[in-house]
Amino acid sequence: EHGTAEIIKINGQDVSQMTFSNFANNPGDKSGGHLAVKRDDVVTIKLIPDYGYQLSGASINGVTLAPQAEVSTFTFTMPDTNVHFKGIFTQTSDEINTSATKVSSASFENGANAAPSGNLRLTVADSNEDTTNALAQVENAVSAEAVNLTLDQIVSKGDGTNWENPVTQLDQPVKMKLQVADYDTAAGYEVVREHNGNLTKLTTSVSEDGTLTFETNQFSTYFIV
């Protein structure tokens, strides 16, 4: 529940390229699986949590699982007995770290658009990027502050360590909310994004408490103008 357990390789060979008996030929899906494997074969499995969940443990008859370089991937050596394995997935929260002087708090919605599994870590930090070009994107701009928005996918290995991968480009956007520190009710605010040298003024709404809301599918440098 809340994830998938599947066998993907045996002795390095993809199971989709192998032939099995009708008795045991399902390497795994959402409903489970049943596969015939020889003793001493090296079995590669995936224990994939849904978004918002992490692998908190794995039940596999006492066999040791070895995390691999690829996310959510483990190996074990087949013992001389039947093995039953499953992932134990626990609901967990995304992580948000805000240290930027201009931003007092941050949040996001639709995180599954950025990470198909595990959780996200959003880091909001000050940037020393020049604001001149960003100011030129906004009519009647007076000042701007640069912040870096960094997004990482975090997937637990089940042993207290994680796979961590940066997320910079999304197919579908997430909704960002940044609360402006020392919000000036008399001023207007816009958000300009700089990604790979391209500047884009984003459609931004401003709430009464100074929270800027906008959608984005790229994570790099942002300017609060």
Feature-to-residue mapping (PLM):
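Short, solvent-exposed loop/turn segments in extracellular or other extracytoplasmic domains
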Residues: 68-73, 171, 206-211
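Surface-exposed loop/edge segments in extracytoplasmic proteins
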Residues: 15-17, 64-67, 162-165, 197-204
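Conserved "repeat-terminator" motif of extracellular CCP/Sushi domains
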Residues: 1, 68-94, 216-225
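Generic recognition of long tandem-repeat/solenoid scaffolds
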Residues: 74-77, 149, 161-165, 210-217
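Feature for mature exported/ectodomain regions
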Residues: 3-10, 90-188, 195, 225
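Extracellular modular ligand-binding repeats in secreted and cell-surface proteins
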Residues: 3-54, 78-81, 168-182, 218-219
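Short structured motifs
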Residues: 29-32, 71-73, 159-164
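Surface-exposed interfaces of beta-sheet-rich extracellular modules
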Residues: 41-72, 183-197
